[in-house]
Amino acid sequence: MYSNKSFQRRQRQQVAESRSEEKFSRSLVRLNAQSLLDSSGNNTTTKNVNSDVVIVVMEGRGSCEGHIGIALHDTCFPEIHLCEFVDSREYTTLKTMINVHEAFDIVIQNGNEERGSTKLLGEALMTAFPEASLQSISSKYFNSERGERQLQSLMNAEVSTVSEGCLRRTLALGALAVLLKYIHETRCVFFRVKSLRIKEMGVNDTCMIDFVSWESLEIVDADDASKARKFQMKQKRTLMSVLNHTVTTNGYRLLRSSVLQPSTDVYLIQSRQEAIEELIGKPQLKDKLRRTLSRAHELDRVIAMCIQTSTSWTVRESEAKINQIIKLMHTLKVIQGIRTLLHSAKMKSNILIEKTEFLKDPRFDQIMNILVEKVDDSLLDGKKNSLHLQNTKCYAIRHFVAVQLDLARQTYEEIIRNVEETGAREIAEYFHGNSSVRLSFSQSRGFHYTFVTRQAESVTIPRYFLDVFRNRTTVTFNSRKVIAYNDRLEQVVAEMFLASDVIVCDMIEEMQPMIPVLYYAMDALSSIDFLCGLATYSDLRDTCKPTFGPSFSISQGRHPILDWDDSEKTITNDTCLTRDRRFGIITGPNMAGKSTYLKQTAQLAIMAQIGCFIPANYASLPIFNRIFSRMGHNDELIRNKSAFASEMSDAAAIVQYADKNSLVVLDELARSTSTEEGIAITYAICEKVLKLQSYTFLATHFLDIAALANYSNAIDNYHFLPQTDENSTKKHKLLRGQYRGPLYGFELVELSTIPDEVIEHAQSLATELRANVEDTERDYDSERRRIKVYMNHRFRECAEYFMDTHGEKWKEEKEAIDKMKALRKYLVDELAKIDSQEQMCQ
């Protein structure tokens, strides 16, 4: 058995690769906070990092300054991602990508610290990711020509998405050369020729959300962002936790990446919407798909096993391969079930038809035939105890395939019989056949005795037995004879695993031409799980399918997280921003709902761009390329930044990078400084954002900011009412117009322990100041002009909607006539209200 080709090839490979490349290893320099920084920075990344993800960063110099090339690989996932982009000096895009993929090992260039380039990058990454393993390596290893040769050698063209332009991206190719070298030296892993999927990541086909906004907008919880779906227990409600109805790890991974980087491809979004709509209409099919998917194993680790070769050959690795080959066979049966379900349902949505065609590939049957010939999965449906799980792997290869394996099995069975006989004899001799004492088996201890009793602390175990451990209701122990059998059993099991591994390697070699179909299956299963999860959410709540256009219009929208917790008590609010009226200023009381409304706006936009239905009666949104937020006012003491400095840093990024395809939400901008400075800075930033033509919502306590609407028709004023019910609960209802209600802050002050005379004096001063402000003249002509522009857009929007739904004869529809009459009445009433207010002031 040990003279076959696979074994000989492994021996030659071990000898050839035993010579480690010491120069590369010595050139790796571990960077830490002490070597780069005078003081450590805040931890802005997740607390739980993934040590399997490696990212290599190459920064451009000279004429390429500002360009970043990255190569990224998860050693448990059969893909390498390449990307090259232009980034800011704060490395915002790079930090976001590292957070999305939860990379732990980060490798950068060294040798240029004296000029400051690498040091700036190192400081930025160490500050943002203090728990990551940051290392630098000599620039000579960033060889783009070598990276291109390796790409051409390892890439499987059928499943890879690498354009011709990628071959000219020298920074990404240089990073690829170091990545492959690093994986080889630190993980002892090689990739088979023409087996790897290499994907070119684009930064222009996704909506970029700054990773600082992930937690402030309640998209993900930073403390639990890197935990796998099945390990997430009690945690703070986030958009991710509300939408997560996936049943596979890869489905969860696709959902997370989609939420953190929503798509900007309208065709992809609409294809997802069609699939979700179809799945909602077929609830039985959706439930069957989810139940079937829950039985599937993750193909990423199976593919990784098939495309990777290691310089070591251990019993543990052999056992893992046997386990993966069993999972592959089981998953292929699941694929057959999903294929049958989708085919019989006669799906109409393009994305589900495409995935069904992938699953019909004849190469699945070819792989199954290879496995059926040598793999026996008859033990999979038996008992699920530890001994059965070991037997599943020991008997995974069919009988009469390898003589040495069959001989080892005979020895294994003989040892099992002997240890069972010994156990029965010792229990009868020392415990007189007590039924509470039995022979047990575990992976860690092997065979041992278990005494089940409620008096574990006081029960007496004969001195003949060893290794006595007392738990609450059991006592475990062993004997010398059983321990001797365990040692022999461990040796025989190792022989069986190594012998089986040779057969598994032969099957992997035979399956190599069919490996691309496993990539298709992995994508298909994760996509179907992703769509079923979104369909489950959309079906459980009152949602609508959003459309896409130039206006940001939502009718009766609800906060996704609040709606999930208690849909009956959730307050609905409208949202309306257009190209002509693209800036909304929101004023109102404390705790009235301003911040919650801003989060609702951003979350609904994200949900729409991942293809999900959103909690509203009607929604039409633009496609956003970037979403900016400035929320929260915390000092960053470790980085020596005050709350105001942190605010201005975020505002600078917005002013610099926002454009007409951006959504900007600002919560109480410049609150952490004096009133005069705060108003002036807010004015200036608002004027700049207006010129950028971004869709913007600003929540502020500076009532003077609302006067900006007098100078620009692009601004609308909104406010929340201060009135409360008997339980001091705010109404949380957004209304049009500037806030002109009472001095709402004193309602909360009166609930505190501040003396009454202090509160009364403060109220008198505030009333006097308020009266001075209200003496300012209102520009009624501007208000009339704004309401006319706004209603003109509403008329046009309604006409387009009814034309799409009813065709050219939409004007004859009663619904359209009633809607137009209602809009006309609203316009007349608003103009009359302005006229009456003007007459009262004269």
Swiss-Prot record:
InterPro entries associated with the record: DNA_mismatch_repair_Msh2 (IPR011184), DNA_mismatch_repair_MutS_C (IPR000432), DNA_mismatch_repair_MutS_core (IPR007696), DNA_mismatch_repair_MutS_sf (IPR036187), MutS (IPR045076), MutS_con_dom_sf (IPR036678), P-loop_NTPase (IPR027417)
GO MF: ATP binding; ATP-dependent DNA damage sensor activity; double-stranded DNA binding; mismatched DNA binding
Compartment(s) where it occurs, according to its Swiss-Prot or TrEMBL record: Nucleus
Pfam families: MutS_III, MutS_V
Origin: domain of life: Eukaryota
Region (Disordered): 1-21
Knockout-associated phenotype: Worms show maternal effect lethality producing 95% inviable progeny from hermaphrodites. A high proportion of those that survive are male. Mutants display severely reduced crossing over, resulting in lack of chiasmata between homologous chromosomes and consequent missegregation.
SMART domains: MUTSac (SM00534), MUTSd (SM00533)
UniProt effect for mutating G116E: In me15; defective meiotic chromosomal segregation
GO BP term, pick one: homologous chromosome segregation
CC per GO annotation: nucleus
Main location: nucleus
Record keywords, A-Z: ATP-binding, DNA recombination, DNA-binding, Meiosis, Nucleotide-binding, Nucleus
Residues annotated as binding ATP: G588, P589, N590, M591, A592, G593, K594, S595
Assembly description: Heterooligomer of him-14 and msh-5.
Function description: Required during the pachytene stage of meiotic prophase for the formation of crossovers between homologous chromosomes. Together with msh-5 and zhp-3 plays a role in the activation of DNA damage-dependent apoptosis at the DNA damage checkpoint in pachytene cells. Not needed for pairing or synapsis. May promote crossing over by interfering with Holliday junction branch migration. Has no apparent role in DNA mismatch repair.
Similarity comment: Belongs to the DNA mismatch repair MutS family.
UniProt protein name: MutS protein homolog him-14
Organism encoding this protein: Caenorhabditis elegans
